[in-house]
Amino acid sequence: GTTSRGLGDVYKRQEFNLRGAMSAAHQVKPDIAIQIDLMLATDTPETHDYGEMELGKGPGMSLFSFHGRGTLNGVIPHPSLVDLMEQSADLKNIKLQRSAQVGVLTDLSYIQQLGNGVASIDMGFPMRNSHSSLEICNINDLVSLEVLLETALSNITSEFSLIRS
C-alpha cells in the first residue's frame, strides 16, 4: 500500500552534479518522485532521427532514459505512474507525448534507488536548443503540463497502489 504524508516541493541543483536531490530524498523518504524537466524536442531537420517530441503537441512522459556513459544510469518509470499520467491526460483531453532517449540523465536516476526503491517518472515539456541562449518552448505545452500534474497529483490518495501487477 501507499502511505500518504502530504505533498511538498523540494528544490535542488541538478546541473551541479546530478545528485542534488538525493540529500533531500534521504530526509523525506518519498514513496513517489516526479521529475519535471525539459524534454529534448526532435522536430527540426537535424534532430528528427532522435525521437518524436514536438513543440506544441503537449507535455511529455519519458518511458525510458539512459545516459549511456560509464556508470551513469537512467529511468524506466513505474507502471502505476505511467497509468496515472495517461488517465489524467485522457481526463483533461491533453495530448501526451512519449519519449525514449539515450544521452539523458536526471536526479531521478539516483532517487529511484533509495531505500527499497522509489516509484519514479520523468515528466516534462518539449524544448529546442537546450543549454543555449536561444531555448525555445511552446507556452501551451507548459500550461498543459501544469494541468496534467495538478490532475495526477489530486488522484494520488491513500488508495493509490504502487503494487506491480
Please tell me what each predicted stretch does:
Residues G1-L7, Y11:
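Single conserved hydrophobic/aromatic residue that forms the stacking wall/gate
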Residues S4, A25-V28, M53-E54, Q113-N116:
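Solvent-exposed alpha-helices and their adjacent loops that cap or buttress functional pockets
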Residues K12-N17, L38-L40, M127-N129:
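Acidic, glycine-rich active-site loops and adjacent beta-strand->loop/helix elements
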Residues K12-R19, Q101-L105:
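Active-site glycine- and acidic-residue-rich loops that bind
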Residues L18-M22, T44-D49, S109-Y110, S133-L134:
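Short, well-ordered secondary-structure micro-motifs
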Residues S23-Q27, E46-M61:
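Short, surface-exposed, charged loop/turn segments at secondary-structure junctions
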Residues A25-P45:
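A glycine-rich helix N-cap at a beta->alpha junction
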Residues G60-E146, A152-S165:
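Active-site-adjacent substrate-binding region
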